[in-house]
């Protein structure tokens, strides 16, 4: 019961959640991958999962915002040396596109091409771009904070996991493809998470409930942060995002 009584947060520092330019680049990259997949393979799978996951994740971002589950600061784009604040709903859409459409599209696209060296070079070029984008940033002001073990989120995560395993059981011909997509997403997310943690842009907070039912902030150690971020990578990204495959591909 300690896991339920205590409060665990993922904290984002820096301007990652507020940098609209980078999010737009990721959106464009996802669209280009989908176009290439359609032209060369006559497949709309990437388009389907990109559009579907973006819509759903934008709704999730909106719910996180209005319920104060995630504290979100204003998002900006820089154009012609001007800093322009984006309307909140455009910000939520771009956040939803990156969190949903970008990750699922990249996961599916490169998961299908793990045995092709040319595509792996492109994949790792993307990863290098992401790393450079991380290590060249220095702003460590807190930008968002998300409570990951609310009763609602744990129930949803449990239902999503059951649903995905049910779909895998009923559609065994898709197991290998889903496994490759899972591997691709977890690999990408692990590298991104490591470098954002290393630079101080991503960390965790833990609040323990004492005998008086009051929350006391714990001094977190590396193991605490590792386990919380690992949960985010494996469950909230790897397993949860397979839901979009099952909804829009099968």
Which residues does each PLM region occupy?
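Aromatic-rich, lipid-facing transmembrane alpha helices and their immediate juxtamembrane interface loops
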Residues: 1-250
């Amino acid at each position: 019961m300690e896991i339920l009584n205590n409060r665990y947060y993922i904290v984002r520092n820096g301007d990652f959640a507020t940098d609209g330019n980078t999010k737009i680049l990721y959106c464009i990259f996802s669209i280009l991958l989908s176009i290439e997949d359609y032209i060369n393979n006559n497949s709309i799978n990437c388009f389907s999962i990109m559009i579907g996951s973006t819509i759903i994740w934008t709704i999730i971002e909106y719910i996180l915002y209005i319920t104060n589950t995630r504290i979100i600061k204003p998002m900006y784009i820089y154009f012609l040396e001007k800093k322009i604040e984006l309307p909140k709903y455009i910000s939520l859409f771009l956040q939803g596109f990156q969190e949903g459409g970008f990750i699922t599209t990249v996961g599916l696209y490169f998961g299908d091409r793990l045995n092709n060296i040319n595509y792996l070079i492109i994949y790792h070029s993307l990863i290098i771009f992401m790393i450079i984008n991380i290590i060249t940033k220095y702003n460590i002001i807190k930008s968002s904070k998300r409570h990951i073990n609310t009763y609602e989120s744990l129930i949803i995560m449990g239902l999503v996991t059951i649903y995905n395993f049910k779909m895998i059981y009923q559609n065994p011909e898709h197991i290998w493809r889903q496994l490759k997509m899972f591997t691709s997403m977890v690999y990408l997310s692990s590298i991104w998470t490591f470098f954002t943690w290393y630079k101080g842009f991503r960390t965790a907070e833990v609040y323990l409930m004492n005998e008086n039912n009051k929350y006391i902030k714990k001094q977190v150690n590396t193991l605490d942060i590792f386990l919380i971020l690992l949960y985010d990578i494996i469950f909230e990204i790897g397993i949860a995002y397979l839901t979009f495959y099952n909804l829009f591909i099968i």
